[in-house]
Regions:
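Short secondary-structure boundary elements
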Residues: 36-41, 46-52, 80-81, 181-182, ...
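P-loop NTPase Walker A phosphate-binding motif
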Residues: 41-72, 76-80, 88, 444
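Conserved Walker B catalytic segment
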Residues: 153-195
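Flexible helix-coil transition and linker loops at the boundaries of alpha-helical arrays
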Residues: 394-399, 449-463, 492-501, 534-540
């Protein structure tokens, strides 16, 4: 974001960064700070100013954000943060990434070696650790939370550490658990934790003496006028327009900027930034009522090929790898790059990363949302399907890492068979990390996708197995009524197929549930039914499961 501290002052951010984040004090102690604001008031901009100022010289700064689809992706912001810390690149093979993680971790402190397997697993690198493989999901979850926390705290003993999380309103439950753990340990480390979020986000940090919740209010009239002087200039003829803009936008900085940009694009204003003049009279000027309407109008005025490019980028997400955009844009490379240059000049997108692969991002989350919403449903569906196909083609060796994104695009692209496959893989991956709520969301979405496939025997078998998957994640959450409902549905489907093996597993799972809730006699009835089925089928695995729970029921 190309803006100076002087420009930040012009934005009316009346609380100076030094007052918000006293970096000198964090050298001795830790603080956490959070912004709770509506979009467009300048949270991200103020953070950018702070982390790029002299106040953080000599600090290690780690940044991460949450995506709107990230709630179904356990640890997504944490993974981004770790990739930045270990200087992971998209092209890194597992061997190379293992070397980076192992080398940096052990050079930091050999006492962190027990955390190595958890960190490698988070980064989708096989740990090759038999002890890790023997752990059950809750134990892995605890090791993961402890490992990331210990890494950050140990690093903070070497140098002041700033950890920044953006858009916590989109955070997943496992990242939330890590933040809660980290906040508890802040008093013992030189660590500044910054977070921003919208008002609907809830947390339990408010009572901490070292936590500050901050709010950037909309600009007061005098600050809004100062911002408009910086944007428009000081032509006396602009004063009625300035007042109209201040009244219409209610002091929202992003709304003000976008409104000015709209007036420039529609030739109401002529000249250059900081030296505009009116080309028409104020009574004839119409300013849209909301920032979303301003953005929608700006997008509609783009040349058709640039509008299509922006919309395609929005379907990819807020972060847009150039290679992926090229794969779906259906434009020659020269045309695509020219279009991106124009979109940057219009301040709709900007380059977020140059190395090792060029990546773009939207100027603001609202820009991304409005661009995505401007697409017709059929075109949106087509682009999602193309993106899923492009990810498979571009990253064939990294599909495990990309599985949540693949599931997201395949489902919204209505590529139902792939959606079922990737959603089930994503759910299994989440369950392995003890991210049970995210696993449930994936498995339930897979069931929705499955309903769109032809009703074959294989499809019904998958429907049963997905309900078994749901059982494994719902039980740790204590959601027993939903669990029973899915098991009864599985039983009904298995009976229609006369699938005795799956009926046996339904009986085992019902027996386990009844036994765990203190109904041993009823549980034994189900387990004995499973034993009989196992004996008839000579199914060793089913027999072992039935005998195991039968032994518990008669104890």
């Amino acid at each position: 974001m190309a803006i100076s501290l002087k420009a930040a002052k012009a934005l009316g951010l009346s609380i100076p960064p030094s007052a918000l984040f006293p970096a000198d004090k964090v050298i001795q102690c830790s603080l956490s700070a959070g912004f709770a604001n509506e979009p467009g008031v300048g949270k991200s901009r103020l953070y950018w100013e702070f982390i790029h100022s002299h106040r953080t010289h000599g600090w290690l700064v780690l940044e991460s954000g949450s995506a709107s689809y990230g709630k179904a992706t356990p640890y997504l912001p944490v993974i981004d943060l770790l990739r930045a810390y270990f200087q992971s690149e998209p092209r890194d093979e597992p061997r190379k990434l293992r070397e980076k993680v192992t080398g940096k971790l052990l050079s930091l402190d050999r006492a962190l070696e027990p955390a190595l397997s958890a960190l490698l697993s988070l980064l989708d690198v096989p740990p090759e650790d038999p002890q890790w493989e023997r752990l059950d999901p809750p134990q892995r979850r605890q090791r993961t939370l402890d490992g990331v926390k210990r890494l950050l705290l140990r690093e903070s003993h070497l140098q002041p550490l700033l950890v920044m999380f953006e858009d916590l309103h989109w955070i997943d439950a496992e990242t939330q658990a890590l933040l809660d753990n980290l906040v508890e340990r802040l008093p013992t480390a030189r660590l500044l934790l910054l977070a921003n979020y919208r008002p609907e986000y809830q947390h339990a940090w408010g009572g901490k003496t070292y936590y500050r919740q901050l709010r950037i209010d909309p600009l007061p009239p005098e600050s809004a006028d100062e911002l408009l002087r910086a944007l428009l200039g000081q032509d006396p003829g602009l004063q009625p327009l300035k007042q109209l803009l201040i009244d219409q936008t209610q002091g929202n900085p992003f709304f003000l900027e976008e409104s000015v940009q709209t007036l420039v694009e529609t030739r109401v204003l002529v000249g250059e930034r900081g030296a505009y003049r009116l080309a028409t009279t104020p009574p004839s000027i119409q300013v849209p009522a909301t920032v979303q309407a301003v953005l929608a109008a700006r997008i509609d005025r783009l040349p058709p090929e640039e509008k299509r490019l922006l919309q395609a980028a929005a379907v990819i997400g807020e972060e847009v790898p150039l290679a992926l955009l090229q794969a779906i844009a259906e434009e020659p490379e020269e045309t695509l790059r020219r279009g991106l240059t124009h979109l940057q000049a219009a301040e709709l997108v900007y380059e977020a990363r140059l190395f090792p692969d060029l990546e773009y991002t939207f100027k603001h989350g609202l820009t991304y949302q409005v661009a995505y919403g401007s697409l017709l449903q059929e075109r949106r569906r087509t682009l999602h399907a193309l993106i899923a196909e492009a990810i498979e083609r571009l990253y064939p060796d990294r599909l495990t890492e990309q599985v949540e994104r693949l599931a997201h695009h395949a489902f919204r692209g209505e590529v139902w068979e792939k959606a079922v496959t990737y959603l089930r893989q994503a759910g299994t991956k989440a369950f392995a990390r003890s991210a049970n709520r995210e696993a449930v969301a994936c498995f339930e979405e897979a069931l929705v996708a499955l309903q769109h496939l032809p009703e074959t025997r294989e499809m019904r078998e998958q429907a049963i197995d997905l309900r078994f998957d749901l059982r494994t994640s719902l039980f740790p959450l204590g959601e027993l009524e939903r669990l029973i409902g899915y098991l009864r549905e599985a039983e009904g489907l298995a009976r229609t197929l006369d699938d005795q093996r799956r009926l046996g597993w339904v009986s085992i799972y019902m027996g386990h549930l009844l036994w765990s809730t203190g109904h041993s006699t009823d549980a034994l009835t189900f387990v004995q039914s499973a034993q009989a089925i196992a004996q008839t089928l000579q199914d060793f695995r089913l027999q072992v499961g039935a005998n195991f729970y039968a032994a518990w029921c008669v104890r």
